[in-house]
Amino acid sequence: RRQRQMCIRDRLPGDITGINVYDRQKNEFTLRKGPVFTNILLADELNRATPRTQAGLLECMEERQVTIEGVSYTPGEPFFVIATENPIESAGVFPLPEAQLDRFLIKLSMNLPTKEEELRILELYMEEDPLKSLTAVVSLEELLAARAEAAKIFVHPCIREYMVQIAEATRRADGILAGVSPRGTLGLLRCVKAYAYLQGRSYVIPDDVRTLAVPVLAHRLVCS
């Protein structure tokens, strides 16, 4: 299952998580689930939502649960949040707080396509929207099984020491007010194991750490 939520200024936290509504026929309140009750949530232009609404995602992103009026609910399993944001110089945006940025596993920047890539895009759209013909390449069960196998990937103590050294270096570096938190180091561990699994290896190598350190850690730094 997937959901897309367009984030705008008048969006409320309940629009993301869900609310209890009164059912006159049953004479009781029932839960109207929000977009977080899914497997993949696309939060489009997240930094256009107000800080209060952005905070509505924090609990479900970190704890995999949603609390509505004191009652905790579990979203989908697995649960992923993919967010896009406008450039910070755009009008009407709210910078994401450090606590929320730290909950995103990876941050990628989307650059403009090359000439060849743009020509390929035009070719794909010559007849019909290619998105309409997309088919699933993996089932939910296969995805969960792959995640379980990736968790078994071996990480030598030297590799773990290497990752901690990188994190500690960010905490001591001049010009950085806040370095990588332990959550960031754990995120790097998860990513390098998954990367090694996708490369067909049962173990992590130093190049895996070097490949993923920037996309996993850079957005967590607070620079002066």
Locations of the language-model features?
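Glycine-rich phosphate-binding P-loop
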Residues: 1-2, 48
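Short, small-residue-biased leader/transition segments that mark boundaries at the very start
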Residues: 3-8
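Conserved P-loop NTPase mechanochemical-coupling segment
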Residues: 11-15
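Conserved alpha-helical scaffold flanking the Walker A/P-loop in AAA+ ATPase domains
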Residues: 22-42
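Canonical AAA+ ATPase core
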Residues: 23-28, 49-53, 61-153, 193-195
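C-terminal engagement/docking regions of AAA+ P-loop ATPases
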Residues: 170-224
